Design a protein with these regions (language model features):
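Acidic, glycine-rich catalytic loops of TOPRIM or P-loop NTPase phosphate-binding modules used
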Residues: 1-32
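C-terminal accessory helical subdomains adjacent to catalytic cores in phosphodiester-
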Residues: 22-36, 41-169
């Protein structure tokens, strides 16, 4: 949220989600509801240890939505044939996700498709109209967040699909 900045580190996101469960303004039902915590796994490729421990603790009372290397991957999946045209031919570069200036490789791929800054321009939300394309294409990727090191990974579409298919029982 606007008032909660600099908490993008996965461990901090999980702690933030846990704290929000006690926020009376959101009426979180601890018996029925779960927080969905979205984070990038690229930080665990080289810099940060204990990914497995973090996932195990985070999954206890939450749903973890993970992208490797970054959320821009999920956004890229909203474009028809982006898996075949953009992701598959660039697999190695996507996983390395090196920076050119301040921009990562996956960010640049998405920028090439959208022409907009996905981190600052709210028009990126228009991609939601193509979420079914993203869900379909995501199935061609690794969706197992327990085995994502060195693999292009995304499970956000599968979470959306499971929410859509939830009959509430």
């Amino acid at each position: 949220t606007e008032g909660d900045r600099d908490i993008s580190y996965p461990k901090n996101l999980i702690a933030f989600a846990e704290a929000q469960k006690d926020n009376q303004e959101i009426a979180f039902d601890k018996e029925r509801d779960k927080m969905i915590i979205v984070f990038d796994a690229d930080i665990f490729e080289e810099k940060v240890q204990d990914y497995d421990k973090l996932v195990a603790s985070g999954e206890k009372d939450n749903i973890l939505a993970v992208t490797n290397p970054a959320f821009e991957l999920f956004l890229l999946l909203h474009f028809e044939n982006s898996y075949e045209q953009d992701i598959l031919p660039n697999e190695e570069a996507i996983i390395k996700n090196g920076k050119e200036g301040n921009q990562t490789f996956i960010y640049q791929l998405l920028l090439g498709k959208t022409g907009i800054n996905s981190k600052k321009n709210s028009k990126i939300g228009d991609l939601a109209a193509n979420v079914d394309t993203a869900i379909s294409q995501e199935k061609k990727l690794n969706q197992d967040i327990h085995d994502c090191k060195g693999k292009i990974t995304c499970n956000i579409g599968s979470i959306i699909e499971s929410i859509r298919n939830d009959d509430g029982k």
